[in-house]
């Protein structure tokens, strides 16, 4: 297992200070290990997640090579791959790409038109509200990251304007249970990629507006409006220091309300079918999202006192190191449930809705890994039949000297080798 930094590197070094998991602690389940602490309904901090993963790595004896960024993966003749690191190369029959979906913050083109007086941050750069200059803050994006940061920054005493596009409204609790409990037991989180009508669209769905807090506080748009956050539409562009927002805010909010209602209907139907309806509080529906009668469409950033912008506009994977033609025009690997069919022996894991709706969660790794190992083993069996041996081995010829910057946070990500 090749890791660019430390085990659980992103959780240790690339998260803001107050971040907690969106999923309850009981949902932290890995093959052979699950959360066994005294707060199963709580939410781990980033540091606690790092410890959880590191402990697991030690317990299973994972052969991790830390401080080993992968700088290239290329085909090796007719079979297998060559994986390059600053210090050496590996020849392998199969390769599992586990670098994740959140390597590179997505910053819209509008950033190039921001006035020089406005400081810009991505979630990977933001640590806490003290990092920000005095003045108003524009947060762009209203998925889980955007609404959490908008809440934190507003409560720090700064006026926040939140630019809202497509989003998934969530509520932490429903009928006396965590929403994730309902989605887990009802099978929503275990829906397979080959059971949905449009998997491409399903993989692009933003993360739900939830936060993991001790007080189970809500972070949907109504909760943010209640503490003074100004809600505007999607940021369309910036012209002459003026931010222009889409007029689709009401439509986006009505759609998010509709989808939340559908999810709650699914939960209610499951509770009735499985005899749980009478043992939990009765069904109810939440107030519709409150949208200003005349949402702001233009904001002069300088005159409006905007001192900083936080680009909570999503992340993209980084495959700049992958020299195999399997990446599409949008920078995503073409695959069938994690099996890269155009590159035999190459597999993908840890991506949104890879094989199931929970594929990008810690809890989703177990089932996906089991499925992919079956496919991988069948591939290796075929190679062994033809060649008589399989495996991965170091190749030390013509390898460059180790780089001194191999632990930089912007180095290429880890790759798992089998």
Regions found by a protein language model. Name each.
Residues 1-5, 9-13, 43-391, 414-418:
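Flavin (primarily FAD) cofactor-binding/catalytic cores of flavoenzymes
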Residues 6-34, 224:
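Redox-cofactor-proximal catalytic regions of oxidoreductases
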Residues 36-40:
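A short acidic, helix-capping loop that chelates divalent metal ions and anchors anionic groups
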């Amino acid at each position: 297992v090749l890791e660019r930094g430390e085990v659980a590197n992103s959780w240790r070094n690339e998260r803001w200070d107050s971040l907690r998991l969106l999923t309850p602690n009981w949902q932290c389940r890995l093959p052979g290990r699950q959360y066994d602490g005294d707060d199963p309904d709580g939410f781990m901090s980033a540091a606690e997640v790092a410890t959880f993963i590191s402990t697991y790595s030690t317990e299973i004896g994972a052969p991790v090579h830390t401080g080993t960024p992968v700088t290239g993966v290329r085909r090796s003749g007719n079979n297998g791959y060559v994986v390059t690191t600053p210090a050496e190369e590996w020849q392998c029959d199969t390769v599992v790409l586990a670098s994740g979906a959140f390597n590179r913050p997505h910053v819209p083109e509008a950033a190039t038109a921001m006035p020089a007086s406005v400081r810009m941050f991505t979630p990977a750069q933001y640590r806490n509200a003290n990092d920000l200059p005095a003045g108003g803050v524009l947060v762009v994006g209203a998925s889980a990251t955007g609404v959490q940061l908008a809440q934190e920054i507003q409560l720090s005493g700064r006026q926040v304007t939140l630019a809202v596009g497509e989003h998934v409204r969530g509520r932490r609790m429903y009928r006396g249970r965590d929403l994730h409990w309902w989605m887990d037991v009802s099978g929503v989180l275990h829906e397979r990629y080959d059971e949905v009508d449009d998997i491409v669209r399903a993989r692009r769905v933003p993360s739900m507006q939830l936060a993991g807090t001790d007080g189970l506080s809500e972070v949907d748009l109504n909760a943010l409006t209640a503490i003074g956050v100004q809600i505007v539409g999607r940021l369309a562009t910036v012209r002459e220091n003026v931010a222009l927002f889409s007029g689709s805010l009401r439509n986006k909010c009505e759609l998010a309300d509709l989808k939340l209602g559908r999810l709650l209907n699914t939960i209610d139907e499951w509770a009735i079918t499985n005899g749980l309806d009478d043992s939990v509080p009765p069904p109810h529906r939440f107030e519709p999202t409150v949208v200003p009668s005349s949402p702001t469409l233009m904001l002069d950033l300088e005159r409006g006192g905007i001192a900083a912008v936080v680009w909570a506009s999503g992340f993209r994977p980084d495959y700049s190191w992958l020299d195999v033609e399997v990446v599409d025009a949008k920078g995503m690997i073409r695959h069938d449930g994690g099996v890269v069919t155009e590159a035999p022996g190459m597999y993908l894991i840890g991506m949104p809705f890879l094989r199931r709706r929970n594929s990008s969660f810690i809890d989703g790794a177990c089932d996906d890994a089991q499925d992919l190992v079956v496919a991988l083993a069948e591939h290796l069996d075929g190679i062994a039949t033809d060649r008589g041996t399989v495996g991965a081995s170091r190749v030390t010829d013509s390898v460059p000297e180790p780089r001194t910057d191999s632990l930089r946070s912007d180095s290429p990500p880890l790759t798992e080798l089998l």
